[in-house]
C-alpha cells in the first residue's frame, strides 16, 4: 500500500491540491505541520509499502525555510530516501546552485519535472553531471499519475537535441524492452 504525507502548509491551496492528487490515485493523504507529527504519522503507517512525503517548494536561497524543512524531514529517519524535484526548464547555473543548496538534505536522486515544456535538456545533463546525481523519475505532462515515469537512459537521450537512439540496437539487446535505469550502456549516436 502507498500513503502520502504533506508538510506543505505554506502555499495557499497546497493541501487541497495534494488531497486531489491522492484522490485521483486512490492514495490516502495526511497533512502534518511539525517534525513530531511527521514522526507519529510515519509510525502509524509503518505497514505501508511506500510513504511519499510532499514538501514545500522552497527557494534554494531561503536558508531559514530550508533549515526548517530539513529539521522536519529528519523525522523521516535514516532509512528515508530523498529525491530533489527540479524543473527541466531551469537554466543550468540555477539548477546547479539549487542542487548545491539542497546537498545538506543528502538527496539520493533527482526528479526532473516539466520535460514536456522544453526542447532542450542540456542544462539538466550538465547540472547532473557536475553534481554526480542520477535521475530517478521524470514528469512529462499534467496528468497524474500517467505522466510520471521512471527515468530511463533511452528516454533522456531522446530528449537531447542532436541525438538519436538506435531503436534496433536497443530491441536487439533488450528484446524489445526498454533498458532499466541501472543499465546506463544505451548506445546513442550524434546525428
Predicted features and spans:
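NTP-binding/hydrolysis catalytic cores, primarily Walker-type P-loop NTPases
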Residues: 108, 126-191
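P-loop NTPase switch/communication element
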Residues: 1-32, 43
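Conserved ATPase-coupling elements of RecA-like P-loop NTPase cores
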Residues: 14-16, 60-66, 94-96, 121-123
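Conserved beta-strand/loop subsegment of P-loop NTPase cores
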Residues: 3, 53, 78-86, 103-145
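Short, solvent-exposed amphipathic alpha-helical segments in soluble enzyme
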Residues: 19-22, 70-71, 99-103, 125-130, ...
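Switch I (G2) and immediately adjacent beta-strands of P-loop GTPase domains
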Residues: 17-22, 36-55
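Conserved nucleotide-binding/hydrolysis micro-motifs of P-loop NTPases
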Residues: 9-12, 36-37, 57-60, 88-92, ...
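Inter-motif core of Ras-like GTPase G domains
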Residues: 43-53, 64-90
Amino acid at each position: 500500500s502507498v500513503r502520502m504525507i504533506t508538510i506543505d502548509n505554506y502555499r495557499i491551496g497546497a493541501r487541497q491540491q495534494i488531497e486531489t492528487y491522492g484522490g485521483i490515485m486512490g492514495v490516502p493523504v495526511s497533512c502534518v505541520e511539525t517534525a513530531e507529527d511527521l514522526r507519529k504519522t510515519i509510525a502509524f503507517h509503518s505497514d505501508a509499502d511506500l510513504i511519499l512525503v510532499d514538501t514545500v517548494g522552497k527557494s534554494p536561497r531561503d536558508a531559514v525555510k530550508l533549515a526548517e524543512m530539513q529539521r522536519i524531514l529528519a523525522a523521516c529517519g535514516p532509512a528515508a530516501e530523498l529525491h530533489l524535484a527540479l524543473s527541466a526548464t531551469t537554466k543550468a547555473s540555477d539548477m546547479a546552485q539549487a542542487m548545491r543548496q539542497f546537498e545538506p538534505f543528502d538527496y539520493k536522486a533527482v526528479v526532473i519535472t516539466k520535460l514536456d515544456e522544453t526542447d532542450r535538456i542540456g542544462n539538466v545533463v550538465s547540472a547532473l553531471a557536475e553534481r554526480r546525481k542520477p535521475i530517478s523519475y521524470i514528469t512529462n505532462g499534467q496528468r497524474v499519475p500517467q505522466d510520471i515515469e521512471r527515468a530511463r537512459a533511452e528516454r533522456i537521450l531522446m530528449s537531447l537535441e542532436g541525438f538519436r537512439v538506435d531503436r534496433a540496437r536497443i530491441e536487439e539487446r533488450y528484446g524489445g524492452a526498454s533498458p532499466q535505469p541501472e543499465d546506463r550502456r544505451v548506445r546513442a549516436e550524434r546525428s
